[in-house]
A protein has these predicted regions:
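Non-catalytic substrate-recognition/targeting regions of SAM-dependent transferases
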Residues: 115-122, 126-128, 144-218, 227
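A short, charged
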Residues: 84, 88, 92-102, 106-108, ...
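Rossmann-like S-adenosyl-L-methionine
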Residues: 191-342
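Non-catalytic accessory regions of SAM-dependent methyltransferases
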Residues: 7-131
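A short, sequence-level motif marking secondary-structure junctions
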Residues: 63-68, 141, 211-214
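Short hydrophobic-aromatic micro-motifs
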Residues: 51, 60, 134-137, 199, ...
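A short interface-forming secondary-structure element
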Residues: 131-143
Length: 342
């Protein structure tokens, strides 16, 4: 059994400045570096640390990291972050998805976000489920270092349903933390050798490649927006700019759009759009794939060509220094799009 008292002796402590504990008492998931009075011990990036008020009251435990967000809180109740903790937290996340109808066996959706960072009280962690394959991305050093425990917990809670756990953190984990950022499988069921598979979302089929695709392979967080497009697409000519693998395009076709044009500068993405149109069984004459710069295409089209337009550009700002320019670019893009909708 784990010697908890011994573990507490060696765990680093974060002591907050006077009156800086209020946000934690309201269950805010972060401790900012400016709130810290003292660090007792010498924690490495990703270590679990305990957080105390200036009066010595235990407040939380979480992952330590150098930067403006010094601690990402894992628990407000205990500083024991062990295998049982990971199993309990991931089980709770799955129970929420079952309760909301996302994780129902035999339904018309078999892909969903299992863990959405702070929303599931697991800051720094994303896990997406693709019909038996869990793809995880760590956005903090602590979550990256805990990836084996996380994978083991997923094996326990999903059992035979789990085909694989794939870690795709090389583009999301903090590179300054000196981590070994190589993507790869943390678990594979015997006989499973695929890097892609067809999944269902609201009855629509999509081919997802988690090793080569953006993010975890598919933008699951856009599900409700895709359903929104479905409401308006019938009998309309639709343009999907920055289409990636064509999620919005497939929903528009399924809703009865007259014609859909999908535009993206990535040839790989456009090949997947064509594949998704094919596996969806749609008439190919109703869809055109255009491997072009979306902004250039938008400039050249007549103002009455489309009745419905989806504009979902990539992030223009990766850091605060370019935020103002990015906001201006979004404004120009949206204004141009609005001017071209009939």
């Amino acid at each position: 059994t784990e010697d908890i008292s011994e573990k507490r002796k060696i765990m680093a402590k974060i002591i907050l400045k006077k009156s800086r504990e209020d946000s934690l008492k309201r269950f805010h998931p972060w401790v900012f570096s400016g709130a810290i009075a003292q660090i007792v011990g010498n924690p490495a990036e990703g270590d679990v640390v305990s957080v105390y008020s200036s009066e010595g009251e235990f407040l939380a435990a979480g992952h330590y990291q150098i930067g403006s967000i010094a601690v990402r809180v894992l628990s407000f109740e205990t500083d024991v972050i062990n295998d049982a903790y990971w199993e309990a937290m991931l089980s709770k996340a799955l129970e929420v998805r079952i309760a909301t109808g996302l994780a129902q066996d035999g339904g018309n959706t078999n892909c969903y976000r299992l863990v959405h960072g702070e929303g599931d009280n697991l800051p720094g962690l994303i896990i997406d489920w693709y019909d038996g394959v869990c793809v995880m991305q760590a956005h903090s050093a602590g979550m990256f270092r805990a990836k084996k425990q996380i994978a083991d917990a997923l094996v326990k809670i999903y059992g035979d349903k789990l085909k694989a756990v794939y870690d795709k953190s090389s583009g999301t984990a903090p590179f300054k933390a000196g981590l070994d950022l190589i993507d790869g499988y943390l678990y594979k069921k015997e006989g499973f050798n695929d890097n892609e598979q067809v999944v269902l979302e609201n009855g629509h089929k999509f081919l997802v490649n988690w090793t080569e695709g953006q993010k975890t392979g598919f933008f699951l967080d856009q599900r409700e927006n895709r359903k929104l497009v479905e409401r308006y697409a019938k009998d309309r000519n639709v343009l999907n700019l920055f289409c990636y693998t064509g999620g919005f395009s497939i929903y528009a076709l399924g809703a009865g759009a007259v014609h859909v044009d999908s535009v993206d500068s990535s040839a790989k993405a456009m090949a997947l759009v064509d594949k998704n149109v094919e596996i969806g069984g749609f008439d190919k004459s109703r869809h055109t794939s255009l491997c072009l710069d979306a902004i250039d295409y938008l400039k050249d089209i007549p103002a009455d060509k489309y009745d419905l337009m989806i504009v979902d550009p990539p992030a223009f700002a990766k850091h605060r220094g370019v935020l103002r320019n990015a906001l201006r670019a979004y404004q120009r893009l949206n204004a141009a799009a609005i001017s071209k909708v009939a």
